[in-house]
Amino acid sequence: MHVSNSKFIFVTGGVLSSLGKGVASASIGALLEGLGLSITLQKLDPYLNVDPGTMNPYQHGEVFVTEDGAETDLDLGHYERFTNTNLSKLNNITAGKIYNSVLEKERKGAYLGSTVQVIPHVTDEIKSMILKASKDKDIAIVEIGGTVGDIESLPFLEAIRQLQLEIGKENTLFIHLTYVPYISVAGELKTKPTQHSVKELRAIGIQPDIIICRSEVELPQDVKSKIAMFCNVKPENVISAYDVDYIYKIPLILKAQNLDKIIIDAFRLENKEPNLTKWENIVSSLEHLKDSVDIAIVGKYIKLKDAYKSLIEALIHGGIEHKLKVNMIWVDSENLNEKDLEHVDGILIPGGFGERGIEGKIRALNYGRTKNIPTFGICLGMQLMAVEFARNVLGFKDANSTEFDPNTSNPVIDIMEEQKGIENLGGTMRLGAYECLIKENTKAYEIYKENLIYERHRHRYEFNNKYKEHFEKHGFIASGIYPKKSLVEIIELQNHRWYIGCQFHPEFKSKPFKAHKLFASFIENAYIYKKERS
C-alpha cells in the first residue's frame, strides 16, 4: 500500500448524529491553515448510496457540488467555506463507492481467487482512498460519518485503526466529538453518554487523543477533568464546543482552548501562533452589524434548513460584506400567500427538482418583477423566471418547462440535448464548473467586473434558445453565455432595480471572508430598496 508523508487527524462522532463534526473538522482545518500548513479534508459516509445525488433533501440535506462535478455531502461545503481548499470527488467517499470498487475488482479477477471479505478487502479499499486524497498535503483531516456504535461505520473505524498501526501513532491523531447534555432543571452537565461513547470506541481498538464536547453551555474545568479521567485523555485535551450564534466563531473558540498547540505538539511540528486575523475580523463584523435586511426564500424543502445550507451561508456572507444582518423569511412555495412578501426587501427562489410547489414560485417571481423588488433566481429559480415572463409578458399562456409539462406548446425551458435518453439518474446531470462569458454593459458585468467566470452547475434542463429573441426584444436579456454551446447562464431584466437569474449555483463558491459577488450585490440592493421605502 502507498505510504503517505502526511499526518492524519481522524474525527469520529458519538452519542448522537448532527452534532457538527463537519463544522468541527472545518474549524480545525482553519486553525491549521492559520499555521501555514497545507491541508485537505475528507468525509467518509457509511451509507450504501454511491453519492447523495439522488437522495431526498429531507433525508440528507443539501448536495454540495465540487469544481470537478462530484455530488457530495454538505459537510464538504463547510470544509471549503472555512478553508482555502478546493475539494474533488476524492474528498467524499461512501460505502457505496467502496463496495462498488471492490466488486468491480472482484469481477476483473484482481483478488486472484481469494474469498472477498470486509477485512481485508473492504478495509484496504478504504485505506487506499484515504491515502489517495491526502497526497502532497501536510495534514489530512478525515471525518467518519455516522455515530460510533452504528453497524455501517464499523469497516471505516477498523480501517482507520489499521492505518494508525501502519503509518505510526506519531503521524495520527484521533479526535472524538461527543454530546454532553445540560439538564436545565438540575443545572447539571451529564458526562455519562460521553463515557459510554468512548468506551464503545475503545472496544473497537481506538483510543481518542482529544475529545471535543458539544453542549449548550461551556464546560467548567471540573467536568472536563471528570471526562478526562474516565476516558483516559489529558484534561487539557478535553475541548468545550458550546453553542454559539454564528459558526464562524468556532475556530477562535478552539484556539482559545489551545487545540492548535495540542495538535502541533502531538505531531512534533514547529510551535508557532496561528494567524487568525481574518476570523477575528469576521466575528467583529458579525458583532457590529449596522442594520438588517429581510429576504424571503421561497422554497419547497423549507422544513429542513440543511437542504439550503450553502445558500443560507452565502446570504450571511453577503450580509457580512455590507455589515448587515440577513433575516431569512422562509416561505413554503406550496402555500404561498402574497402577504408573506409584502414587507420583504428581497426575494430569492432557490434550486430544486420536481413539479411540487412550482406555481407558488412563479407567483412569487411575478410579485418580485411587477413590484420592482430585488429578486434572485438560482438554477430552477432562473428557469421559472423565464416561464413567468413568457406567460405574463410575452403572452405564451401555456409556457412551461418540459420537466413539468412534456407536451407544452411553448417549452421555454427544455431538456439539454445531451441529457435526452439518459436513464440513470445518479451522476448524469451537467455537473461541476463551466465557463460563462459575460456581456459588457449589463448588470452581470457590473457585478463581476470581468468577462470570463467559472461557476458550478447541477442541472438537466436549460433555457430554450428558440425563445431568446422574443425575450430580448422585451428587455429580458441573456447576459451570461456558455460559449461552447451557447447555453444561457445568466438572465437579467432591464428597467428593473435587480432581477437576475443564474443557471449555476453561486452559493457553492461563497466564503465568509469573500462573499460571492452575486450574493453581495443582491444584499446590497435589497438594503437600498429597504432604505428607499423607509
Swiss-Prot record:
Binding-site positions, UTP: S17, K190, T191, K192, P193, T194, Q195, K226
Binding annotation for CTP: S17, D150, I151, E152, K190, T191, K192, P193, T194, Q195, K226
A UniProt-annotated Pfam family: GATase
Entry's Gene Ontology cellular component terms: cytosol
GO biological process: 'de novo' CTP biosynthetic process; pyrimidine nucleobase biosynthetic process
Binding site for Mg(2+): D75, E143
GO MF: ATP binding; CTP synthase activity; glutaminase activity; identical protein binding; metal ion binding
UniProt activity-regulation remark: Allosterically activated by GTP, when glutamine is the substrate; GTP has no effect on the reaction when ammonia is the substrate. The allosteric effector GTP functions by stabilizing the protein conformation that binds the tetrahedral intermediate(s) formed during glutamine hydrolysis. Inhibited by the product CTP, via allosteric rather than competitive inhibition.
Keywords: ATP-binding, Glutamine amidotransferase, Ligase, Magnesium, Metal-binding, Nucleotide-binding, Pyrimidine biosynthesis
Keyword Metal-binding carried by entry: yes
Catalytic residue positions: C379, H505, E507
Enzyme Commission identifier(s): 6.3.4.2
Enzyme class: ligase
Region (Amidoligase domain): 1-269
Origin: domain of life: Bacteria
Swiss-Prot/TrEMBL catalytic activity: UTP + L-glutamine + ATP + H2O = CTP + L-glutamate + ADP + phosphate + 2 H(+); L-glutamine + H2O = L-glutamate + NH4(+); UTP + NH4(+) + ATP = CTP + ADP + phosphate + 2 H(+)
Keyword Electron transport: no
Binding site for ATP: S18, L19, G20, K21, G22, V23, D75
Pathway(s) of this molecule: Pyrimidine metabolism; CTP biosynthesis via de novo pathway; CTP from UDP: step 2/2
Quaternary structure, from the entry: Homotetramer.
Extra remark beyond the main annotation: CTPSs have evolved a hybrid strategy for distinguishing between UTP and CTP. The overlapping regions of the product feedback inhibitory and substrate sites recognize a common feature in both compounds, the triphosphate moiety. To differentiate isosteric substrate and product pyrimidine rings, an additional pocket far from the expected kinase/ligase catalytic site, specifically recognizes the cytosine and ribose portions of the product inhibitor.
Protein function: Catalyzes the ATP-dependent amination of UTP to CTP with either L-glutamine or ammonia as the source of nitrogen. Regulates intracellular CTP levels through interactions with the four ribonucleotide triphosphates.
Protein's recorded name: CTP synthase
